[in-house]
């Protein structure tokens, strides 16, 4: 059969006709209008984006009142550190003195911002402490240093920036990057494969090449694959050029002569080109990972290959199926699958729908380009159930002249190109406008090679198409999943559409209220705000920072659903770390456990979630602790002027190291708080000396033990002379 396949990226050759085996899916393909092989360094004076993402607090700065009043530093002793830990309710480790009269203490265990604030508040109540502050993090204030992002004279990165009156089509990413950059999220780009590009490679997970051998009817061999073999573990893009010689072959007879597109590399760069590396471009979710999956070859890809690729990319292939098909297990299942491809063959193929259903059941959203035919109908698989179908708009926010719209379209995203509405007087590419040189393309990673990878070098190119629009949506979906991995696919789609920005007045889509263009224009900031609005509010706490081993411990939590979200929440407690305990009532707000013996640091996570996948967690950190004790001491006795030695022997039921603090130590005597050694080299004067010793395990102090040191005068004669005196008198 023969079908017409349109690229979802638009250019000088915007439509290809291909011969297919089953439904054949072609690139929603490209036009290269600008090439940048290098870029100037970022100039100074960029606009700051505000606070950066800070790690959890790890240190406190403490000022002691005695040091402040004396104006001189006081030695930091073990008892003083122990007291600080006890007062703060957590184990603190002494780090170092500061240049000023202050000291840095480190949390022995990770703490949240709220927990650090609690510790600081407790310490501030101690009369011995003048002040406490959480040691914060300072960052340079920057826009991404990638040179094309920073060049405002030619706004190549308009599609990522906040919308303005003159450039209304931006996806509004800068404010979102203060919240998340996609770390932890995986986006599968099922496309032409990947070219090794410096501005992309660090974020690439190499997946699989799904392109099968050609059918005998099409000449057999690997003409479409163009890599000399069939399916394998190398998703590299070998190039997809078409020559006049290729067109002489039946399989490529309806294809247009063209250079290699490097389509998958451009799409992947829009999702996750490396950010803040001082060169090139930046991706929507530039700390996410792209799972490169190759399913499009020269001119097109086979529908059956693409369906398999969807299953595999989502991690939905069962082990038995993997064994049967020879497919390896996917170690990096994607939460987002991008399909910048399409077919005009009509309805959604059953194999594609089944693959999409399986991917969604595995928790992935499937984002698909609507096509580039300029029609009020969308291509397949954009018309499959459950996908996020993406049309494209221009820098002005008008529907792009090539972009398909119609029933099933979910949202519009930056795709570049020319306006549909002539009355908008959209300036052509490269012309001088009020805001600088007009750039009508989507700028991303590519190659300038015309054929094989070895014929070109990594560059940055502009392309237009719904192929370019779809990865913007995939990138923002990755940001949502990075922020909340538990989201359901329909929930993620609902957030994206509910938060979409209205089309500007006078544009094609603003003039059609039938929903043909979807909910509006992609807005990353509004999407993340919507996520926060629907996330439950939770708290969790323990009875005290330190609990006694063997005691019954009750944890408590609160969970409040947000207006507009589901009002029924499910609760779950999990032990995160520490000696294993048995949690009872772990699906309620008040679980219970018995503190283990021996004890140790314990961490528990409380999560409240709803059926849509909105979830919030709070962690409780506490310590099960047994009190240290001191073995019974034998009271030492000495003669005036003689030495006195004894050593304290302490034990701790948790195996924590025991230190000691002593009071009543006589003048001239020493007590080592680490070893427990008492030494008095010249015990004088005679008398009884009571020394009180308190053991500490660094968290709590045990019972005080006392020992009485007896110092006696030398024995005297009582009416008779001693032997020395008698000898001196010659009487002995």
Where are these regions (language model features)?
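Extracellular S/T/G-rich loop segment that most often corresponds to the catalytic His/Ser-adjacent loop
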Residues: 213, 364, 379-482, 486, ...
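Solvent-exposed loop segments of extracellular immunoglobulin-like
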Residues: 565-572, 654-660
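A cross-kingdom C-terminal cell-surface attachment/processing module
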Residues: 722-732
